[in-house]
Regions:
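N-terminal, non-cleaved signal-anchor transmembrane helix
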Residues: 262-358, 370, 374, 378, ...
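Helix N-cap at the start of a conserved alpha-helix in ABC-type nucleotide-binding domains
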Residues: 194-196
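Conserved signature/switch motifs of ABC ATPase nucleotide-binding domains
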Residues: 157, 178
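Helix-to-loop junction immediately C-terminal to a conserved catalytic motif
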Residues: 82
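Catalytic Walker B motif of ABC-type/P-loop ATPase nucleotide-binding domains
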Residues: 183-186
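H-loop/switch region of ABC-family ATPase nucleotide-binding domains
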Residues: 219-220
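Conserved ABC ATPase signature
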Residues: 158-162, 166
Length: 538
């Protein structure tokens, strides 16, 4: 892009107002301006000053590029412009609709390109309207945007399977779904090769011309900014400087470089901090003291249980004797086993496990949403977790006794016991899966205007679903084992027969029960393992 000397001079010009004059400027929308920042300051904690006395104006329809190294404050400045970050000093006004393309894109990688673009319209519709899908008109609009960014052939491809450049285009299309007048692009080409970086910057420039957008981009490559930007500013240590490196300050103000710097990217801030010393307990003397303390605790445990080596003298002969009694010594012992009744009780055991686990999943799902710190109300999280700890404390056999007393003997008591036991563990598995989700996509949908339920439905649940389903399969597996002993207290299943055979010391028949349960568990384990692997690779 060739420019005259006058245009080059204009690129280097920065509209800066002094703190004194900024206070006297009317906050009404000025003609020709899209964004105005006055004496802008932003701190993270007490030590990190991300922005220091930044004043500038962005005109409608221009492309303003912000240059600067990592940690210079580019992300923080864009965050203040979008309203995502609240300045600690000064103010910034964006006079029309703003959309942001984040450096880390913040796309839901488990969802298709089309669905991710549709997420851009979440702020325009109620939670109920988008609970089961999006309006047809919005889908047509999203397809048009994907076609405009060159991804018409990738509509239904999960974003996680797209290349870096393609994902960047999806993020651009999602921003366009918000019908912005101002587009903020935070390092839009940071992870791309030179060819793709040029293509993305060219696309952004074309979209600006086509749609009359005001474009503010934070870029670290000076060549790209010179090729596409109308005006270039530079940040260093949170302060505004000119492109030739000279300080840009107000005529009557003096500023000093801050002792610490940072920006809105928390990872960058953490990298800039000094390395933390190893904790005291990991140093050699402290570690030795911990090791000695652990040894003392174990000695105390053994002495308290009165475990003596002489108790092991007959252990091996005793084990072999028991194993020998398990195996039949005559064919008649096998014939006498009530095989039809055993197989019927085995089917009942599997049925109890299936229904009990399913009920547990249904109950655990909303409880996990309440217990997850990134989803539920903060004032409820701790209370729900305390209740869940109490539920997990009760063994499944005790739950069975409780429900036998409540509903009587039979499989219903077993089903209720398995569901109660499952809730304690599944809820923990689920809320841990919710909390492990990348916070970027839910945060991005929140900026768009999505409600809490919309963020959960469209960003948290898709990412957590593989882990949640995997946990449910594991629980079903476990419940088959647990259900096989609930019959001991007459709560249904094959456990009734196991108890009967052990009471009459019919060990071969008890072994037959355990063997058919083992076969079912092995088959179920093989199937669930394959399913879990497929879920993880989704």
């Amino acid at each position: 892009m060739e420019t005259s000397g006058a245009v080059a001079t204009e690129r280097n010009r920065i509209d800066v107002a002094s703190r004194t004059s900024a206070d006297s400027v009317d906050t009404a929308k000025p003609d020709g301006l899209a964004i105005r920042a006055r004496a802008l300051g932003l701190r993270y904690g007490r030590d990190v000053k991300a922005l220091d006395d930044v004043s500038l104006e962005v005109r409608k329809g221009e492309h303003l590029a912000i240059l600067g190294p990592s940690g210079s404050g580019k992300t923080s400045l864009l965050g203040c412009m979008s309203g995502r970050l609240k300045p600690t000093e000064g103010n910034v006004d964006s006079f029309t609709r703003v959309a942001t393309i984040h450096q880390d894109l913040r796309l839901v990688k488990q969802r298709s390109a089309l669905t991710n673009v549709l997420h851009g319209s979440l702020g325009s519709f109620s939670t109920l309207r988008t609970l089961f899908g999006f309006p047809t008109g919005e889908k047509r609009k999203a397809i048009d945007h994907l076609n405009r960014v060159g991804l018409a052939h990738r509509l239904h491809t999960p974003v996680g399977r797209l290349s870096g450049g393609e994902q960047q285009r999806v993020a651009i299309a999602r921003a366009l779904m918000q019908d912005p007048k101002i587009l903020l692009a935070d390092e839009p080409v940071a992870s791309l090769d030179e060819e793709n970086a040029y293509a993305i910057m060219k696309l952004l420039d074309e979209l600006r011309d086509d749609r009359g957008l005001t474009l503010v981009s934070a870029v670290h490559d000076r060549r790209l900014t010179e090729a596409f930007a109308d005006r270039i500013i530079e940040l260093r240590h949170g302060q505004l400087i000119t492109t030739d490196g000279s300080r840009q300050t107000a005529a009557t103000s003096e500023t000093k470089l801050p002792a610490a710097s940072g920006n809105g990217d928390q990872a960058t801030m953490l990298e800039s901090r000094p390395q933390v010393e190893r904790p005291a307990w990991m140093r050699v003397p402290a570690f030795a003291a911990l090791a000695i303390s652990a040894m003392v605790i174990y000695v105390w445990a053994f002495l308290g249980l009165d475990i003596a080596p002489r108790q092991l003298e007959n252990a091996v002969p005793g084990m072999f004797g028991f194993i020998r009694n398990l195996f039949p010594t005559a064919l008649a012992q096998l014939v006498e086993i009530p095989w039809p009744a055993l197989l019927g009780s085995l089917v009942e055991t599997v049925q109890m496990s299936l229904i009990g686990t399913t009920l547990g999943v249904i109950i655990s799902w909303p409880l996990a949403a309440l217990a997850a710190k990134n989803v539920g109300p903060k004032y409820l999280c701790s209370s729900v977790r305390v209740i869940l700890n109490m539920v997990r404390t009760v063994p499944s056999l005790i739950w069975a006794l409780f429900f036998v007393a409540a509903v009587g003997f039979g499989p219903l008591a077993g089903v209720l016991a398995l569901s109660a036991y499952s809730v304690g563990y599944l809820t923990k598995f689920f809320y841990e899966a919710f909390e492990a989700v990348d916070p970027g996509p839910p945060s991005a949908l929140g900026e768009i205007g999505a409600s809490g339920l919309q963020r959960f439905r469209h960003a948290v649940w898709p990412a957590a679903k593989p882990a949640a389903l995997s946990s449910s399969l594991f629980m079903l597996e476990y419940n088959v084992r647990a259900a096989s002993v609930l019959g001991i207290v007459d709560a249904g299943g094959i456990g009734y027969w196991i108890k009967q055979f052990l009471d009459y010391r019919n060990f071969p028949a008890a072994l037959a029960c355990l063997t058919i349960v083992l076969v079912v568990v092995i088959v179920l384990d093989a199937v669930s393992t394959r399913l879990r692997l497929r879920l993880v690779n989704v």
